[in-house]
Amino acid sequence: MKIDRLRRRREKRASHGRIGLGRVILMALLVLGTVLGVALATSYQSVTADLPDIDEMQPVGLGQNSRIYDRNGKILGYIAGVTNRTEIPLARIPVDLREATVAIEDKRFYEHGGVDWVRIVGAAVRNAMDSGGLRQGGSTITMQLVKNLYDPDAPRDFSQKIREAHLAQEVERRFTKDQILAKYLNGVFYGQNSVGVQAASLTYFDKPVWAINLPQAALLAGLPQAPSAYNPFVNPKDATTRRNVVLQEMADQGHITQAEADEAKASDLLLKRGRTYERKREGYFFDYVRQELIDRYGEQRVQNGGLAVRTTIDPRLQRAAEQAIAGNLGQEGDPAAAVVLIDARTGYIRAMATSREYGKDSQFNYAAQARRQPGSTFKTFVLTRAIADGINPYSTVYDSRPIDINDPRWGPIQVATYSNSYRGAVPISQATLASDNTVYIQMTLDVGPERVVDIAKKMGVQSDLPVVPSIGLGSGEVTPLEMAAAYAPLANGGFRVKPIAMTDLGTGIPKGDLATPKRTRVFQDGVAYEVTRILRDNVTSGTGGAANIAPNVAGKTGTTDDYTDAWFVGYTPR
C-alpha cells in the first residue's frame, strides 16, 4: 500500500512536471512568436517606408530572341542572344506544367495575396535557429516574380524579403493570378541559357511547351530552384529525383492521382537536346539580314528585342538558285559559285545562294561578301554611258584591232581580244555581242574612265573602283549582289533600286522606310531600252547564248584572266 502511494505521488509529480515543462515551452514559443511578430512588423514598416509605388519602378526588360522569316512567313531561324527566351500566352502552357509549378513553388498561390506569411515566419524561425543568414526561402511565386522583374541583383537578406513582400502585394492588386503565373513562367530561368518555359522546352525536349507530357512538365517545374544542380543533361539522377518530388507534391495536393504520379515517376527523362535556337535555313542570307539589323538597330536590340523580321527571300526562287548551282558546279573540287536574284522594280532580294554548304567551317557569303573582278560584265556600264551621252551604238563604228598605245594621260595601254581575232571596222552593237576588248578600251577612253565609274556607282555599285582605262573591261572588284542591283535600272526603265532584304520587324515596332523601295532615276527609259535591246541580242546570238532559256532575257557574260572568275549578269525587262 505504502509503495503504491509513493508510486502515485511520483507519477503525479512527474505529470505536473511534464505539464509545467509543456507550459514553459508553449510560453516560450508564444513569446518568440510575439517577438518575431513585433520584429517583423517593425522591419516591415522600416523597409517599406521609403519604397516607391510599383508604378514608378521600371521593370527589367527580359527581352526575347528575334526571329527571321521568309517572305511567306515561314521561320528561317532565331537570332541567338546571351539567353534564349520566347514569350507565349498562358493558354499555350499545359495545365500540368502550371499545376506542377504551383505545387512545388507555392502551393497556396491561389489563396494568398502575394505573401504567404506562414511560410515566411517558418523560414525566418528555421534560419534564426540556424546561425543567421537567410538560407531557406519563404518566397511566393509573386515574390519571385518581383525579384526577377524589379530587383534581380538585390542581396538575399531579410530586408529584401520584406521589400519583395510589399511589392508582391502591390502586384497582386494590379494583376490576376493567371497574369502573374504567365509572367512568372515566361520569365524564370530554367538553365542552359533558357528563360521561360518555351525556351526550356525547346532546349530540353526539342519541342514546343504545349507538346510536352506530365513527366516532362514536372521536370521543368523542378528546375528553377537550382537550374545547374538539376540540369538533366549534366545530373540526370538528381534531375530525376527532383522531378519525382514534384510529381509527389502534385499527387499530395490533388492535382493528379497517385497512380498517375507513380506512372510518371517510372518514365525516363525523355530528353532530346534541342537546336531550335541554333538551327537556321538559308544561313548565308540569314547572316546577311542579321548583320543589317545590327547595323541599323544595334546588337542588344537585335539579340533581345523580340523582333519578328519578315524578309524578302522567296523559297521557290531560292531553291531554283541552289539547284542551278548544284547542277553545274556541285562536285567536290568545283570552283565556288554564287547566285543573287533581285526584283528590279523594288530591289527586294528574292534569292541568295552559294555553292558552299553553310556551317561552322563555311560562313563566308560569296554572294554578298566576295569581291571579284567582273570582267566583261562591266562593259555594260561603258555601253550605258555611251548611249546616255547620245552615241548611236548601231552607227558608231570602232576599229577592232590590237591596242598598243602610249596614252598621254594614262601611259602605255596594251589590249587584245581573247581569241586574238579582229574584225576591223565594227559598230558598237556588234562589238558588244563579240565582247571585243579592243573596241571597249577605246570607248572607255572616249567617254572617260571616271564617267564609267560614275555611271556604275549611280546604277548601284558600291565598292571602291579604280579610275583607270581598264575599268571598262572589269578591272575593279565587286560582289554579285552589287552587280545584280546595278543591272536593275536596265530592267525597270532607268531607276536605281537599293537591295532590300526585310519588309517588316513585327507588331508595334516602327520600321520607318525599311521596306520602302528607294527608286532614283539615273537615266531615261530610252537609254534602258537601247541597252536592253543589245543585251537581248547578246543572249540570242552573242556570248550569252547559254542564258537563252526564256523570252526577253538580256545580259552580259564576263571572264577574267586565266578564267579565274566567270560571270553572267542578266535580267528580264519589266
Question: What label would you give each PLM region?
Answer:
Residues 1-68, 108, 128:
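N-terminal type II signal-anchor transmembrane helix
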Residues 25, 46-63, 213, 300-301, ...:
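Beta-lactamase-like hydrolase cores
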Residues 65-72, 76, 93, 212, ...:
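A short, well-structured edge-of-sheet supersecondary motif
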Residues 100-102, 106, 250, 321, ...:
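Active-site SXXK
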Residues 110-120, 195-198, 257-260, 360, ...:
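Short, well-structured active-site flanking segments
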Residues 130-155, 275-279, 391-452, 492, ...:
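Conserved catalytic neighborhood of penicillin-recognizing serine enzymes
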Residues 133-315, 319, 323, 457-458, ...:
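Non-catalytic, structured segments within soluble enzyme domains
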Residues 311-332, 339-343, 352-353, 359-368, ...:
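A penicillin-recognizing enzyme superfamily signal
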